[in-house]
Amino acid sequence: MANRYWKKALTVLVLGAFVIMGLSSLALAQQAQWMMDAHKMMEDGWKMYNDGQRMVIQGKEMNDQVAVQAGFQDKMVQGDKVIQDGRNTATQGATLFAQGEKTFTDNLTNPSVAQKGLKMMMDGFHMTTDGSDMMAKGVTMNNQVAQAAGATEKFTQGNQVINTGQDTMANGAKLFLQGETIVLKNQQ
């Protein structure tokens, strides 16, 4: 009789262990899914943002050529310095983003480390947006120089490229922030 009791108890324990393992596997799968969804949105948003940033730089270079031809590039030194500082900040942010992405992808089986990678990606993105804000300020400064030199119309084409780039960056930022919201909602 006692032997049968122990067999039943052992059976219940084994079944309980399987249920617990199944539930924990389900929880891990759900955690992995939201992390993958967030990563995908953040990665796609980053790519779009980066494409927009390249357009802004291209438009700035177009305006630089106009300024050289019109003879007032030396008056754009302050704006160019702010733009360069912004590019440097954005580059540091991109480096942190890349480190975070590598940390995430290298540690998919370790959720706590993978989450740290997502956090690094978020920090890198925000650093990059700070740099982009600085670049926008420098572009505005250079546009004021062009206006004072009577060359606003000559900056039109470069500024169109810059505006398209800024719109692309804004759309990329929206997508990135949707992924970030998923991370913040599920953080442990």
Which residues are covered by each model-predicted region?
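Bacterial N-terminal signal peptides
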Residues: 12-22
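Hydrophobic alpha-helical segments of integral membrane proteins
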Residues: 20-21, 26, 97
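Immediate post-signal-peptide N-terminus of mature secreted/exported proteins
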Residues: 25-87, 91, 182-188
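Mid-chain, structured segments of secreted extracytoplasmic proteins
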Residues: 70-116, 120
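Charged heptad-repeat coiled-coil "stalk" segments of single-pass membrane proteins
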Residues: 98-131, 138-142, 148-150, 156
